[in-house]
């Protein structure tokens, strides 16, 4: 079992943690998040970005992690970036907790996401269905108010 954690923070009040667990290279990865400080009753895009570089805030993280050179999509789509985690949904207090299992995201092997950045975006991810070029790259998920680097944990 490999475990990793990402603590997100930024220039906004959005903070939280995301935990990853994977049993083996062929197994799906369990992703659990607890994030607060977002707008109430909102959907906010959450993606794994290519670089673990936050030198200039979340903008240094680069594009979505996309080792297969696909277009942006929903987590359940076969044509999607590895880093496309879709939207988190917030409650009346702007908090979001949840768990998903993802067979594209890996902690083990050559496409490991350890050392890459998770960005919690300021807008809703249109899941690549926005009928424009930017939708196919970013899902039009907007600014990057909070992020953190995924690190191995015990």
Curated annotation (Swiss-Prot):
Q: Where is the composition biased (Basic and acidic residues)?
A: 124-136
Q: What is its EC number?
A: 1.15.1.1
Database matches in SUPFAM superfamilies: Cu,Zn superoxide dismutase-like
Q: Which GO terms describe its molecular function?
A: copper ion binding; superoxide dismutase activity
The record's InterPro entries line, in alphabetical order, gives: SOD-like_Cu/Zn_dom_sf (IPR036423), SOD_Cu/Zn_/chaperone (IPR024134), SOD_Cu/Zn_BS (IPR018152), SOD_Cu_Zn_dom (IPR001424)
Disulfide bond residue pairs: 58-147
Binding positions for substrate per the UniProt entry: 144
Cofactors (names): Cu cation; Zn(2+)
Positions of the UniProt region annotated as Disordered: 124-144
Q: How is the cofactor bound?
A: Binds 1 copper ion per subunit. Binds 1 zinc ion per subunit.
Name of the top EC class for this enzyme? oxidoreductase
CC terms in the record's Gene Ontology section = cytoplasm
* Cell wall biogenesis/degradation is among the record's keywords: no
Residues where Cu cation binds? 47, 49, 64, 121
- Locations listed in the record: Cytoplasm
Q: Which UniProt keywords apply?
A: Antioxidant, Copper, Cytoplasm, Disulfide bond, Metal-binding, Oxidoreductase, Zinc
* UniProt binding sites for Zn(2+): 64, 72, 81, 84
Pfam families per the UniProt record, alphabetical: Sod_Cu (PF00080)
> Per its UniProt record, what CDD domains does this chain match?
Cu-Zn_Superoxide_Dismutase
Q: Which reaction does it catalyse?
A: 2 superoxide + 2 H(+) = H2O2 + O2
Task of the protein: Destroys radicals which are normally produced within the cells and which are toxic to biological systems.
Kindly give the PANTHER family that the UniProt entry links to this protein: SUPEROXIDE DISMUTASE CU-ZN -RELATED
Q: Quaternary structure?
A: Homodimer.
This protein is called Superoxide dismutase [Cu-Zn]
Q: Which organism is it from?
A: Colletotrichum gloeosporioides (Anthracnose fungus)
Q: Report the gene name.
A: SOD1
């Amino acid at each position: 079992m490999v475990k990793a954690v990402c603590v997100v923070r930024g220039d906004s009040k959005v903070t939280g943690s995301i935990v990853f667990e994977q049993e083996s290279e062929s197994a799906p990865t369990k992703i659990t998040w607890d994030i607060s400080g977002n707008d109430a009753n909102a959907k906010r895009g959450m993606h794994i970005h290519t670089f673990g570089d936050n030198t200039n805030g979340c903008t240094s993280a680069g594009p979505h992690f996309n080792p297969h050179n696909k277009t942006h999509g929903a987590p359940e789509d076969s044509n999607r970036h590895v880093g496309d985690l879709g939207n988190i949904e917030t409650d009346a207090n702007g908090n979001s907790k949840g768990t998903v299992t993802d067979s594209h995201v890996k902690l083990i092997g050559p496409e490991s996401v350890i050392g890459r950045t998770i960005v919690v975006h300021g807008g809703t991810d249109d899941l690549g269905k926005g009928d424009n070029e930017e939708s196919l790259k970013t899902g039009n998920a907007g600014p990057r108010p909070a992020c953190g680097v995924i690190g191995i944990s015990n």
